[in-house]
């Protein structure tokens, strides 16, 4: 192999390793068997969610995972592998891909990493069932507001009882 090719591959490994380090979440899938239309729809959905999706050679992924400190992730790089990277939203790649697997049997989640920790297929699927950040914040807000709301209703009920008795 020529030195130019080796240098180019080393550069690719470095680039992918940096993406792995910076990613909030990584989802590795086997997209073998997807039609062109399905692949296009999947890529569009991921792009709209701010997720980068690439098909990368396993040898490059393995070396990049080692450099990024995700050695355990090497086990999922068997057969054709495509990787979804998200830098902001931890849930987005898992949710989009998991939703897509319901309509496209050919797409299979192999595993991934969540905030630097290697995760199994089951953990990625569990992550996909969670609401996004805004949904979680609204749930938290409603939980925090509930006691205040209950006190307000109690005070109002007491006031109405006193008015009715007078």
Swiss-Prot record:
PROSITE patterns: RIBOSOMAL_L10 (PS01109). One of its GO terms (cellular component) is large ribosomal subunit. Keywords: Ribonucleoprotein, Ribosomal protein, RNA-binding, rRNA-binding. GO terms for molecular function: large ribosomal subunit rRNA binding; structural constituent of ribosome. It comes from the Bacteria. InterPro entries: Ribosomal_uL10, Ribosomal_uL10-like_sf, Ribosomal_uL10_bac, Ribosomal_uL10_bac_type, Ribosomal_uL10_CS_bac. Part of the ribosomal stalk of the 50S ribosomal subunit. The N-terminus interacts with L11 and the large rRNA to form the base of the stalk. The C-terminus forms an elongated spine to which L12 dimers bind in a sequential fashion forming a multimeric L10(L12)X complex. Belongs to the universal ribosomal protein uL10 family. Forms part of the ribosomal stalk, playing a central role in the interaction of the ribosome with GTP-bound translation factors. This is Large ribosomal subunit protein uL10. It comes from Streptococcus pyogenes serotype M6 (strain ATCC BAA-946 / MGAS10394). The gene is rplJ.
């Amino acid at each position: 192999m020529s030195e130019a090719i080796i240098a180019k591959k080393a550069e690719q490994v470095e680039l992918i390793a940096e993406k792995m380090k910076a990613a909030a979440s990584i989802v590795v899938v086997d997209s073998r068997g997807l039609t062109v239309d399905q692949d296009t729809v999947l890529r569009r959905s991921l792009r709209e969610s701010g997720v980068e999706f690439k098909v990368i050679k396993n040898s490059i992924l393995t070396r990049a995972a080692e450099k990024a400190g995700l050695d355990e992730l090497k086990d999922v790089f068997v057969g054709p592998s495509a990787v979804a990277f998200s830098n902001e939203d931890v849930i987005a790649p898992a949710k989009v891909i998991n939703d897509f697997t319901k309509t496209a049997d050919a797409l299979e989640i192999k595993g991934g990493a969540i905030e630097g920790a290697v995760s199994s297929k089951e953990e990625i699927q569990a992550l996909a069932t969670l609401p996004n950040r805004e949904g979680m914040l609204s749930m938290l807000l409603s939980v925090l507001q509930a006691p205040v709301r209950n006190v307000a209703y109690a005070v109002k009920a007491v006031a109405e009882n006193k008015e009715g008795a007078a």
